[in-house]
Every structure is written in C-alpha cells, then in structure tokens.
Regions:
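Trp/Phe/Arg-rich N-terminal binding region typifying the photolyase-homology
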Residues: 1-166
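Glycine/tryptophan-enriched, flexible segments
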Residues: 150-195
C-alpha cells in the first residue's frame, strides 16, 4: 500500500550504504512525495580513529560516490555533511522542509544515545521519526525462550532462530518501483578524500 501523506522526508543513511533492499528507504519512498537522502560523517566517530587515512573511511567514500552517481542518474542527489548529526539532522530537516526523518536502527551504544537526542529535538518541532530494523535478521526481543527471556544456551537459540527464518522468511524491500519519489534536486559535488 502506497500512502504519500508526507510531503518531504529525509532519509539518513548510516551503516546501510545502498539504495536496494533498504527498509527505511522503502518505507520513506512509499510514505513520502519527495525523499531527500543524506549521509553524515559524524565527527565524534571520526575523532576516535587512530589513523587519519583509515580504510573504513575510504570504503564509505567509495560507497557514497556510487550512491551519489546512482541518484544523479535519476535526477536526485545525495546530501553529504561532516559534523555532529545532533545539529545537522534538524538543520537539514528545516533546509529541505521535511516533516519526517526515516532511518534504519543502529544498535551501538553511542548511536542509540545520539539517535535519542535527535528524535527528542525533532519531536519538539513536531517532526516524526521512523526507525526500522535493517542490519539484523532478528532484534533482541524477537527470539525469546518460552518464559519471554533471552536464551542463555546457544543451541536452543539457534534452533529457534532457524525455525523462525524457515516459517517467516526474510523480508526484502524492493525500492525500485518507488524511486520516482526521490527528491529531484542537485547538490554540491562529492569532495575528494584529501579534502
């Protein structure tokens, strides 16, 4: 079901650097008239890197370059910023007149705390935040013992995990038919890694 009740929305890419089989993108495209995609190089994470030219940054840069090219080919673009997402996300929401933020969940402690700050700030401005499961098959409370507690023994957990996959399958999110709802705009060029 497509329900474009949101005019503009912002999709925040993080660990999920792709435009296919992407839960938050799929949901944003189905619920929004125009979706702006962004990625933020979080300076609080970058500052912790011991090596300035870390290979992970190079990998991310190449993935962003590919995403930007794919978006450019269909008249859209990728917003890439460097800074604190707690400041930048609300700023981008205002700049692009978005009424919703879509993102896939991140399960790291720092990310959970950061995302909570962002959601609270957006909520004050009546901006909806939609978070989706993406980087895991099952979240921590989706596979529990019969007592509704986490497993402490691996084999019963594994058996339940496999049974659940067999019974429910793994959902895939076909974004292609909805990419017409990507915002049509041109953003600044991608900076080189040296910049």
């Amino acid at each position: 079901i497509v329900n474009n009740n949101i005019n503009n929305s912002l999709l925040w890419l993080r660990r999920d650097l792709r435009l296919y089989d992407h839960n938050a993108l799929f949901q944003a495209l189905r619920k929004s008239k125009a979706v702006y995609c962004c990625f933020i190089f979080d300076t609080k994470i970058l500052e912790k890197l011991k090596i300035k030219n870390d290979r992970r940054i190079e990998f991310i840069w190449h993935a962003l370059k590919e995403i930007k090219e794919d978006l450019n080919n269909i008249g859209s673009d990728l917003i890439i910023e460097i800074g604190d997402p707690v400041i930048l996300i609300p700023s981008l929401i205002k700049k692009y007149k978005c009424s919703a933020l879509f993102l896939n969940k991140d399960y790291e402690k720092y990310a959970i705390e950061r995302d909570k700050k962002i959601c609270n700030a957006l909520q004050k401005d009546n901006i909806e935040t939609y978070k989706y499961k993406d980087q895991v098959i099952f979240e921590e409370k989706e596979i529990l013992t019969q007592n509704n507690s986490p497993y402490t023994v691996f084999t019963p957990y594994k058996n339940n995990h496999l049974k659940k996959i067999f019974n429910e399958g793994i959902t895939q999110f076909d974004c292609e038919p909805y990419k017409i709802n990507l915002a049509q705009f041109k953003n600044k060029p991608l900076q080189s890694l040296k910049d």
